[in-house]
Amino acid sequence: MTLFASISLISNPLKGSNSRISSSNGSGILMGSNSITCGGCGGTTTTIKSSGSFTIDSSINVYVDSKNVYSRTYHDSFNGCSS
């Protein structure tokens, strides 16, 4: 089963930013920064589909003149849609 059907990306990503989405069955994808994923259970614009739970880990690093001026890491877990 595919983790999700499509991904929408915003152009001009920040340097050093990335997101990882993985499901409980081990499938996943590494995306560029400023990525947007939208999904739901049975919606018309479902992007993320999972038979179990999934997690989203994001790290954001902002560089100004080669100096890291901002770093932030996020971790979220969700219950996926039953199939």
Curated annotation (Swiss-Prot):
One BP term from GO: sorocarp development
Give one Pfam family, short name only.
Answer: Coiled
Into which family does the record put it? Belongs to the hssA/B family.
Q: What is this protein called?
A: HssA/B-like protein 43
Source organism of this protein record? Dictyostelium discoideum (Social amoeba)
- The gene it comes from is hssl43
